[in-house]
Amino acid sequence: MVKMLVLYYSAYGYMEQMAKAAAEGAREGGAEVTLKRVPELVPEEVAKASHYKIDQEAPIATPGELADYDAIIIGTATRYGMMASQMKNFLDQTGGLWAKGALINKVGSVMVSTATQHGGAELALISTQWQMQHHGMIIVPLSYACREQMGNDVVRGGAPYGMTTTADGDGSRQPSAQELDGARFQGRRVAEITAKLHG
């Protein structure tokens, strides 16, 4: 059975929802899934004053455990067209894994959230994939196999590189049913492809 980690960073809970949906999809695809998050870097008093969702259930991951999985889906908030610093800080601690080649041929995939439609989602998806590529991981994108992202009748998440959600910072727009379905699709797709590669 494929062992998968869904690893995320979420300040306001939007990516937490997407990560849970991806984990559901991966389980539907036959994977044994672990859902974890990266540590918060913002001081607790600042996080509370900024209304961060600090009561997330997922346990905190450690960089060394990434080697324990066949596949890793990363979900991160976006800051100025890049992954959030919390995720970058976590990934920057994986140098020891890189030196050992511990993630070579593992499967990787990425999802992101932005506060606006043009908030740099595709840049964040691609730059996060770069980190995976430096580790020798095999990237499985969302791709246009996920037809739910097609159309412009409403704000739709998704890109060929990975699932996205646009969620307002004030909480007025949460991840849509289409975006959550896309995250499930991505989780299932990664699980199924990983099973073919590592089965």
Swiss-Prot record:
Biased composition, class Polar residues, residue ranges: 163-177
Binding positions for NAD(+) per the UniProt entry: Y12
Listed cofactors: FMN
Keyword set includes NAD: yes
Every Flavodoxin-like domain range: 4-190
Residues that, per the record, bind substrate: W98
Amino-acid positions noted as binding FMN in the UniProt annotation, renumbered to this chain: 10-15, 78-80, 113-119, 134
Name of the protein in question: NAD(P)H dehydrogenase (quinone)
Cofactor info, note text: Binds 1 FMN per monomer.
Sequence similarity: Belongs to the WrbA family.
Coiled coil: none
NCBIfam families linked to this entry: flav_wrbA, PRK03767.1
Key words of the record: Flavoprotein, FMN, NAD, NADP, Nucleotide-binding, Oxidoreductase
Xref: InterPro entries: Flavodoxin/NO_synth, Flavoprotein-like_sf, Flavoprotein_WrbA-like, FMN_Rdtase-like_dom, NQO
The protein's enzyme class: oxidoreductase
SUPFAM superfamilies according to UniProt: Flavoproteins
EC identifiers of the protein: 1.6.5.2
GO cellular component terms attached to this protein's record: membrane
GO molecular function: flavin adenine dinucleotide binding; FMN binding; NAD binding; NADH:ubiquinone reductase (non-electrogenic) activity; NADP binding; NADPH dehydrogenase (quinone) activity
Reactions catalysed according to its record: a quinone + NADH + H(+) = a quinol + NAD(+); a quinone + NADPH + H(+) = a quinol + NADP(+)
Residue ranges of the region described as Disordered: 157-181
Pfam families xref list: FMN_red
